[in-house]
Amino acid sequence: MNKKVIKIILFMNEAMNSRFCSIDFTLGCLILIVKENNSDFTLVKDKFSNSENFINILLDFFKENNLNIDNLNFFMINLGPGGFVGLRNILSSIKSIALVKSIKVFGFNNFQILKTTIANQGYEKVALEVNNRFYIKDLKDCDNYYSKFTVQNSLEKNSDKIVKFSKLPKYTSKNLQYILDNKLFIDNKLFPIYENI
């Protein structure tokens, strides 16, 4: 067996039995999901605006739930589209922790999460409303991290084939596991961050 195959097999075992922390601050609320021992630990703070205080919230959350950052295999960061300033603050905090603790950091985006929550696959496009603008992507392209999306001030009149979201639906580590199992994440060395236009 060659080294590349062994590396992929090892990563897939790590992803399936993973312990990770997902951080989402793209749409004005803070969502933390920690998966450990097949259990989800979740914190949701609606209308969270103080990203400078994020590190204290993260550490308190781990302490209150008897979790240990050292046990994580990786962090997963939602890169948008959405707010940029808070995301930048949180991303720098996580990358610092990851550097010190030798923990991997992966990125994903809102379109990947949205696709995992859409039950009716009869839709052709998905639209995410952020600050009175619609970020629109073909549903078939949502798995492709780098595929393009369009930004519009309003939806098309004939938008019955577009599923619209004004916020992310509730999601769990199972939605994130889909991204991991299909290797749809992006490595932190290549992070594009979707900025509000």
List the predicted regions and their residue ranges.
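Nucleotide and nucleotide-moiety/phosphate-recognizing core
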Residues: 38-139
